[in-house]
């Protein structure tokens, strides 16, 4: 067994401990189900029956998102079942989904004395995944580090793996143009007292130079010198005031500026490689200074940036609506009834964010659907090709 598989950090491009990631119920694969198995099951159905494509995801929370991606491609000839891999023991995350697919194949090869030397390019996934079985995972940093780790190589080289481009689904749930609608869902108040798009743009621009440094370290597998956890500490808001929202942006900008200066002194010969990476992120990978928030750690963005800001805004809007009810009520009984009714109609911020599907209008979501369409078209071409 490769020593790389025994290194938890090596297979965790985020470099964060399990306790640092959002804890969600996840599972590993069991049995020997593969795309070929599913294709055989499809052939047993009547000729008029739709083909079933199994899409494995990382967690229960991911099922709705990937359903929203794939449902567009269902037709009279195919449909998708989005599900978690089943196992006796719950496991967590993308590594569980991808590594279990590969390790089952290796064990089969060992039993048949056909085991091949361990590869890092993700090709071992091909025999399990296929036109009837795909994997759908969060990109994390694996998309941006371009094969620097084994898991990243699988993301880049496996044709039947779809990923989010953004760090995670949580980032897309925080898609800036959709956040006002979430506020309305929470408060039932459509008064636009805060410009989410502009504020998220400024926040992204403030953290972008330091974000490039973080990716620079992970590309070289020296992330221990500047981990995601270190990066998150620097980009914390340090308090948010609705009366002066620019103040926390300036605070983050100052902290990032100081950290960038320190990194430049630590790596005096890195200027050219840093600038080359910056160009690559913008021109090839779609990361812009204005959209950096989509690529930072998802649960940090969700819990430490977006939810705290929304709490201040929603509190103000709820208070505004309650004052309106008090002014318009004809008597105290009506006021109490209306306030009680309104209170029971407001919603939890985190829950509404998790249900937010405004990301379907984002360019990132369009890229994911384009990948799904390409995969399905190539699969159809392969299936229609004459057998040798």
PLM regions: where:
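Acidic, divalent-metal-binding catalytic cores of TOPRIM
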Residues: 2-388
């Amino acid at each position: 067994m490769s020593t790389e598989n025994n290194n938890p950090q090596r297979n965790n491009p985020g470099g964060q401990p399990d306790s640092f990631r959002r804890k969600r119920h996840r599972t590993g694969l069991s049995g020997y189900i593969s795309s070929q198995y599913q294709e055989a099951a499809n052939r047993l159905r009547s000729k008029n029956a739709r083909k079933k494509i199994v899409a494995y995801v990382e967690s229960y929370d991911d099922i709705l998102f990937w359903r929203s991606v794939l449902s567009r491609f269902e037709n009279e000839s195919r449909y998708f079942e989005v599900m978690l891999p089943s196992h006796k023991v719950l496991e967590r995350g993308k590594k569980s989904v991808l590594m279990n697919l590969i390790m089952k194949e290796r064990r089969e090869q060992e039993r048949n004395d056909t085991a091949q030397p361990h590869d890092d390019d993700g090709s071992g996934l091909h025999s399990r995944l296929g036109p009837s079985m795909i994997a759908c995972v969060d990109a994390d940093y694996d998309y941006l580090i371009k094969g620097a780790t084994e898991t990243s190589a699988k993301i880049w080289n496996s044709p039947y793996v779809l990923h989010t481009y953004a760090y995670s689904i949580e980032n897309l749930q925080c898609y800036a143009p959709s956040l006002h609608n979430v506020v309305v869902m929470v408060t039932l108040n459509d008064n636009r007292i805060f410009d989410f798009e502009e504020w998220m743009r400024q926040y992204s621009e403030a953290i972008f130079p330091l974000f490039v440094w973080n990716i620079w370290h992970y590309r070289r597998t020296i992330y221990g010198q500047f981990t995601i956890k270190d990066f998150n500490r620097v980009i914390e808001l340090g308090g948010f005031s609705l009366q002066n929202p620019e103040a926390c942006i300036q605070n983050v900008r100052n902290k990032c500026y100081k950290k960038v200066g320190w990194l430049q002194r630590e790596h005096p010969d890195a200027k050219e490689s840093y600038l080359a990476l910056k160009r690559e992120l913008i021109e090839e990978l779609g990361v812009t200074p204005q959209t950096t928030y989509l690529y930072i750690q998802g649960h940090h963005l969700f819990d430490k940036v977006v939810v705290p800001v929304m709490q201040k805004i929603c509190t103000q809007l709820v208070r505004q609506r309650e004052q309106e009810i008090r002014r318009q009520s004809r008597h105290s009984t009506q006021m109490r009834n209306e306030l009680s009714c309104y209170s029971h109609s407001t919603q939890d911020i985190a829950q509404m964010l998790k249900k937010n599907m405004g990301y379907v209008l984002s360019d990132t979501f369009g890229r994911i659907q384009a990948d799904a369409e390409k995969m399905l078209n190539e699969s159809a071409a392969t299936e229609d090709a004459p057998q040798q």
